[in-house]
From Swiss-Prot:
This is Large ribosomal subunit protein eL31. GO terms for molecular function: structural constituent of ribosome. HAMAP family: Ribosomal_eL31. One of its GO terms (biological process) is cytoplasmic translation. InterPro entries: Ribosomal_eL31, Ribosomal_eL31_CS, Ribosomal_eL31_dom_sf. The gene is rpl31e. It comes from Methanococcus maripaludis (strain DSM 14266 / JCM 13030 / NBRC 101832 / S2 / LL). The lineage of its organism: Archaea, Methanobacteriati, Methanobacteriota, Methanomada group, Methanococci.
Length: 83
């Protein structure tokens, strides 16, 4: 059964709790952990557009939040950016 949802993932916590040189990698990790928790799956595949959005303004200026569309097919969760 295929399940589809749209989430707004807050990244403000990552900004406030991380040094500037580690924000983008920690933001990607936070997105992955958020989706693992909310979709109840260990296998999370992030689309390249999400990575480009987080890294768009360099390492230390990540967006405050990201909207993603998530599709769960079996045990695999695939996430893409909502424009």
């Amino acid at each position: 059964m295929e399940e589809e949802r749209i989430y707004t993932i807050p990244l403000r916590d990552v900004t406030n709790k991380s040094p500037t040189t580690k924000r983008a990698p920690r933001a990607i990790r936070a997105i992955r952990e958020f989706l693992k928790k909310h979709m109840k799956s260990d296998i999370v595949k992030l689309d390249n557009t999400i990575n480009e959005k987080v890294w768009e303004r360099s390492l230390n200026k990540i967006p405050a939040k990201v909207r993603v569309k998530v599709v769960k097919e079996g045990d695999v969760v695939k996430a893409t950016l909502v424009e």
